[in-house]
């Protein structure tokens, strides 16, 4: 427990204490995870999502992601201190003690599992818990500091939210959530390596073997291009052969996918261009958000009715 003396010495107020713990969770990362969870739930429920279940599932997912990110901050406190970009994070800055952060992280994880298992179902709780364990043990502990393919395998942790969302609605896992899992798994390397190209000097400084540091920029942008080529066709599997989504999603997925490929190709032609890397990184976020929004809209019954009416008018 943080004593009043320690609070007074390290923070100006209780609000500042809460802010430090909030920052431990890396809150900017969480919304994208929740968007993929929500999209999966909408598809699974065929556009008739149960609002209370949706909110509970998203809250459980938020707690799980916050737990995983806090554990990551604890483990990486040594390299966070060495990098100027991360030195101001709560633990290296001395605002939160590691043992207090650990208690906080474990409490978040337990609360996430309890909430999902009690009010949704056990499978969704177990999947959320597996995401925490995988992110911490496999990615943060085992892969991140030992292999240039860290983000490829480690990306599985960030691909779990659609499984949680689907399980929350159906209580099981069919082919569709695994396609969503694969889509995000393939999307992660282009997204993260574009960022790594911009901050590769930071990683080199602390001996973290990110691909741009180990293999260089040209090899990295080639890998980005290859993974991007896989992302687009995988996004279309939801239309055929799975028949989960229709023509509206198909049109949006093709347009977004085409732009994704254009940006990846432009970066491939100019590996050292940080602006192009930044552009791809930002667009990759935009891409996934809009793709998930298209999934939600396409799954709605009213969308099916409108598309059917338009088809009748065109054919009639």
Curated annotation (Swiss-Prot):
GO terms for biological process: heme biosynthetic process; heme O biosynthetic process. It is a multi-pass membrane protein. Its EC number is 2.5.1.141. It is found in: Cell inner membrane. Belongs to the UbiA prenyltransferase family. Protoheme IX farnesyltransferase subfamily. Carbon 2 of the heme B porphyrin ring is defined according to the Fischer nomenclature. Converts heme B (protoheme IX) to heme O by substitution of the vinyl group on carbon 2 of heme B porphyrin ring with a hydroxyethyl farnesyl side group. This is Protoheme IX farnesyltransferase.
